[in-house]
Amino acid sequence: MTEMMTPAMRQYYEAKQAYPDTLIFFRMGDFYESFGEDAKTIAKELEITLTARGKDRSGERMPLAGIPYHAIDTYLPRLINKGYKVAICEQLEDPKQAKGVVKRGVVRVVTPGTAIDSSMFPDASNNYLMAVAGKEVGKTGKSGEKEMEFGLSFLDISTGEFLTTQFTDSGSFDKLLSELARMKPAECILPPTLYGNSVLVDRLREQTIVQEFAPEISGIEEAGEKLKIHFRVSTLEGMGCEKLEFGVYSAWSALEYAKTTQMRDLAHINTLRTYSNTEFMVLDSVTLRNLEIVKNVRDEGDHNSLYRTLSFTKTPMGSRILKKWLLKPLLSVEQINHRLDAVEELAGNPLLRYDIRDWLSEVRDIERLVGRIVYGNANARDLVALKKSLDAVPSIRDCLLEKAGAEMLKGIAEGLASFSEIEELAKMIGNAIVEEPPVSVREGGMIKSGFSEELDELRDISSNSKQWIAAFQQKEKDRTGIKSLKIGYNKVFGYYIEVTNANSSQVPDDYIRKQTMANAERFFTPELKEKESLILTANDKAVALEYEIFTEITETLSAHSKELQETAERIGVLDVLADLAEVAENNNYTRPQLTEDCKILIRDGRHPVVESTVSGGFVPNDTEMDCKENQFLLVTGPNMAGKSTYMRQTALIAIMAQAGSFVPASYASIGVIDQVFTRIGAFDDLASGQSTFMVEMVELANILNNASPKSLVLLDEIGRGTSTYDGYSIAKAVVEFLHNRGKVGIRALFATHYHQLTSLEEKLKRVKNYHIAVKEEGHELVFLRKIVPGATDRSYGIHVARLAGVPEKVIERANEILRELERESVLEESEDCENGKKRKGKATTRYTQMLLFDPGSRSGNSEVKRGLSPVEAALKKMNVDEMTPIEAMNKLHELKKLLG
């Protein structure tokens, strides 16, 4: 049936055959069109009209959907963000000049991980393509999956950033998932050997889009050779990945995939950085969620996250780098102090900080501007934005060279100074491009007058052709002396010089006869012929020349892409340092001390996010942890009193400190933490068929299997999703395990309502009890938000229920039930004591199963005592030492009557 198709439809099917798993955007004049099943998909996803045109292979009417070519930046991101791949099939020649059907071809394939248009992702986020390589090593890991050796690479083609790492030790599967959570790639590619691993693919697909991709190489050795060719180096040792076999393989996979989709060399990807998970604090996906590092739990936006609380950066590069620093806090005390030195200097010098941030506000997204320039997707407005950005750099550089003292600031200044051509490039753009150019680079109007004599002449000809013809006619009259000479034009002969027969003897020798008429002859000269061509094509030539000039400028800029990217990174780092200094000064943060020991000492610590959102001030609290007496802090207290906030703020202060930020405290000393683990909140994983309790246990297993003596563990209510006996048993076992792990145990904060756990302080030497103080005022409960030593025996659940708006009838009934349970507990305890042994009756079992502690207990450790029952009040007034046996018996009968 192909003979029934038009030539254009045959082109479409050829493109579809080459890219069967990809939607085709097929350029037809002023539209991108799609046909068949692609059209149905596009119409549905973009909510546009589905029509029909022509016939398909079977002779049926062909479904059609199309969008205007100028609206592609609006529609394309919607498809990419839904996980589709889109092949852009462009017209490869001017339809006006085409002989026959217009040549068309796929010029790039846009996938989630290879998008370069800024409309497809936020300025503050990287758009990573992740490539994974590896193999099974046979044994089963702690989490139940097969142990693997993995190489991971992350490539952001919009900025040129390229990273690789490798995990060959135990727990590599969990480390892979942690990197996935931190880097948040838009797309992940796997070789066929790993794509067949359903466990791996399913876990990856929980967080990103997964594609199968087989690079066209024979193996790891060829991958290394291909990378050397791309980077124009003889060895990969300088990049630190020479011995990372799977890292190298994954790196080439990512690069080949990007080259295949973009159909160009990607020269701006000019270096590969190797990193190790031993360089950074590990924050897995659970911890990132629970601590709301870059996204909040409520709607996964960035408001009310740590990142948004600290992010007042001036540049997109700075926003992205700040996010990276928070996701990857450092482990090296020396490197952390380099950052802190720079922040301290900028915080202490407000004039320097103000000037730098003022200049930074002029800087646009240099990284992505350079990426678009190298890709050939930039327009003249991008060049103007780059020029304005480069104009600010010399002022920043000179200011730092003159005033900066911190090593990191001086390094930035020296790096900026090493790019000596920066002013020249800015000047080149400024001389050539108008200040407010049009969006299109194919329609002219972007090059300044005076930049090119040829362009000025073409423009002059195009706009002043009549004046030029009149001037030429007068010039020829004066030269020949023929007063009747005139210049004419027709579509057949073009421009000509007409001389009457009476003046034919005066015709100069350089006139060339074009046409003989009855009363006159028509001539042309080489100059007129040249001008005729210019006049007739002046506008087209002017537009073409403007594009040629624009292309020459972009090629010059592309040749400096590496230096421009390095400049962008230095500017971004400076932006983060200045931002952290600004936040520190505005919020009264202090410089933390970092140590190699296991101590954590925080005075007047505050939760950075909560502090920024609450009115009336935040109640600060101290934290003291070490490996001797304060390794495990057991925190009790009512719901809503602030236990979770207290635990989270401790972790956030440590993360901020190791990221290089000042912290919300009057004093902070942090023994470097290698991992932060959290078990907070209750979530069902319905998609995986996991209950709340199962999710809790999976997270707990990860903590117990992977936490080290340098880790920090936050546990909030272990065992809530099961029976009280089971929950308490698990919670107690966890405390003992973490306390006794290794020689010094693992630093942990554990918030619990299992008040019997507080007795562990007497049995385990490094467990310390703390509680959140509250105050009862009549029926009201006041949360003091202050953490104080000792345990509490009350949860104040009914008080909290009242605060939550539970109907008063329910509250009253709950109090009645509570008093009944307390009365049963007193009676059971009395009988137990009388029998001299523990009772195993139904009432005791039922009550203990619910509460696990004596609600009438008076341990003396609680700061706030609840209201006394009548029996308790009577007992409290008794002076047993002064009572006779008969009086005691009578009082006992009275108490029994009170109990009913």
From Swiss-Prot:
It comes from the Archaea. Coiled coil: none annotated. Keywords: ATP-binding, DNA damage, DNA repair, DNA-binding, Nucleotide-binding. ATP binds at G637, P638, N639, M640, A641, G642, K643, S644. HAMAP family: MutS. Belongs to the DNA mismatch repair MutS family. This protein is involved in the repair of mismatches in DNA. It is possible that it carries out the mismatch recognition step. This protein has a weak ATPase activity. This is DNA mismatch repair protein MutS. It comes from Methanosarcina mazei (strain ATCC BAA-159 / DSM 3647 / Goe1 / Go1 / JCM 11833 / OCM 88) (Methanosarcina frisia). The lineage of its organism: Archaea, Methanobacteriati, Methanobacteriota, Stenosarchaea group, Methanomicrobia. The gene is mutS.
